[in-house]
UniProtKB/Swiss-Prot annotation:
Family: Belongs to the GTP cyclohydrolase I family.
Subunit structure: Homomer.
Organism: Clostridium beijerinckii (strain ATCC 51743 / NCIMB 8052)
Known EC number: 3.5.4.16
Name this protein carries in UniProt: GTP cyclohydrolase 1
Length: 197
């Protein structure tokens, strides 16, 4: 059962943050800010209300993959450059300009291509690490397709690096997650990486 985001509590906390920053939450420009931020958080953190299993169930439409022998074939399905955004769990800073590429080797079931994009989007709607986004996407795609052979490549910019601290805009972070044959077969992993980039 999905968890519920406590929007009232978020409103109260945002109001307190405004006061702590030295501003007046009752002035015209800020009067509705706690409510607006609360609604925004409910939207951008929607993925926090669902477990990986619940996301798999929500976006798990598959098609039978008849007449396909996965033991003798390593044919890959690749969905490239899915745009997502997320928020860093360390600073609550935006992770943006993110592109997710997912590859898997079909077994008995094939997932609808749009569902892979929906899975990536929903996983991004959490307080996250980029590495965990890849791990969660791979786990969910594996749950849905029953394939243990999944790869995820993610690139993105992190607000905690581009707008604070070291302040290096344009710096990209790249992470990879590989499971099954992609993890154990170097040639297959290299082939997948060539296709994914």
């Amino acid at each position: 059962m999905p968890k519920k985001i406590d929007t009232k509590k978020i409103e109260e906390c945002i109001r307190e943050i405004i006061v702590a920053l030295g501003d007046d939450p009752n002035r015209e420009g800020l009067l509705d800010t706690p409510k607006r931020v609360s609604k925004m958080y409910e939207e951008v953190f929607q993925g926090m209300t669902l477990s990986n299993r619940e996301i798999a169930e929500a976006f798990g439409t598959t098609f039978e993959n008849e007449d396909y022998d996965s033991e003798t074939h390593n044919n890959m399905v690749v969905v490239k450059d899915i745009p997502i955004h997320s928020y860093c769990e360390h600073h609550l800073a935006l992770m943006y300009n993110m592109k997710v590429t997912v590859v898997y080797i079909p077994k008995d079931k094939i997932i609808g291509l749009s569902k892979i994009s929906r899975i990536a989007d929903m996983v991004g709607r959490r307080l996250q690490l980029q590495e965990r986004i890849g791990t969660d996407i791979a786990e969910i795609v594996s749950m849905v397709t029953k394939s243990s052979d999944v790869g995820v490549l993610i690139t993105g910019e992190h607000g905690c690096m581009t707008s604070r601290g070291i302040k290096k805009p344009g710096t990209l972070t790249t992470t990879t997650t590989f499971t099954g044959k992609f993890q154990t077969n170097d040639l297959l992993r290299q082939e997948a990486l060539l296709i994914m980039k």
